[in-house]
Curated annotation (Swiss-Prot):
It is found in: Cytoplasm. Its main location: cytoplasm. The keyword rRNA processing applies. The keyword S-adenosyl-L-methionine applies. InterPro entries: rRNA_ssu_MeTfrase_G, SAM-dependent_MTases_sf. This is Ribosomal RNA small subunit methyltransferase G. Belongs to the methyltransferase superfamily. RNA methyltransferase RsmG family. It comes from Mycobacterium marinum (strain ATCC BAA-535 / M). Residues 207-228 are annotated as: Disordered.
């Protein structure tokens, strides 16, 4: 059984800490066995993965609909759903073996979480999940691609929240112009969980502003970037 960082985990998950523990055990066992998590990550599972994901709940309002793009083993979506049961969390993942893992975990933990197999750039996914309040991601792709995938899923003024590493400011500088051309506004780097984690999680936040950018991308013949 994996051991949580007691004070931080208790503060973040409260009475749902047992659910977080069960999810961490899923990651440490089936997650490793199925190749969704490297075995070397087990010893730092809580601070690097579970808590690092859950703390971005600081940036989400009550009852918001949140799409986790490229959810993989459920990060950051499942820790968010456990810590914030008020959120409407959708896990979006294209690979069948990962979708099956996510469905098993959601069922076992009794979470009100939707698992969708697909890619963010697919028209059917955009039609199904468009108008969401937030699109979250973790270790999925560079910011230009994340913006292409995230903006069409968001309502006007919705937010993209991308968990990144210490190079986040450099990546923002590199991709800001492309991001803004795709409809992203107020792009900034925000630390999350400073009261619980050292270092805190680093999150790139961008608001969906000009709706013309994302809408142009629905048709691959138009300028503005067809889905990658």
């Amino acid at each position: 059984m994996t051991q949580p960082l007691d004070d931080a985990a208790s503060a973040i998950f409260g009475p749902r800490l047992e659910l977080a523990q069960r999810y961490a055990d899923w990651l440490a066992t089936a997650g490793v066995e199925r190749g969704l998590l490297g075995p070397r990550e087990v010893d730092r599972l809580w601070e690097r993965h579970v808590l690092n994901s859950a703390v971005i709940g600081e940036l989400l309002d009550q009852g918001e609909r949140v799409v986790d793009i490229g959810s993989g083993a459920g990060l950051p979506g499942l820790p968010l759903a456990i810590a914030r049961p008020d959120l409407q969390v959708v896990l979006l993942e294209p690979m069948l073996r990962r979708v099956e893992f996510l469905q098993e975990v959601v069922t076992d933990l009794g979470l009100a979480v939707e698992v969708v197999r697909g890619r963010a750039e697919e028209r059917s996914v955009r039609e199904r999940l468009g108008g969401s309040d937030a699109a979250v991601s973790r270790a999925v792709a560079a910011l230009d691609k994340l913006t292409k995938w995230s903006m069409p899923l968001l309502k006007r003024e919705g937010r993209m929240l991308a968990i990144k590493g210490e190079r986040a400011p450099d990546e923002v500088r590199e991709h800001r112009r492309v991001m803004e051309s795709l409809g992203a506004a107020d792009v900034r780097v925000v630390p999350c969980g400073a009261n619980y984690l050292q270092p805190p999680a680093t999150v790139v936040v961008a608001r969906r502003g000009d709706t013309r950018g994302p809408n142009r991308r629905v048709s691959p013949r138009r300028t503005g970037g067809a889905p990658a």
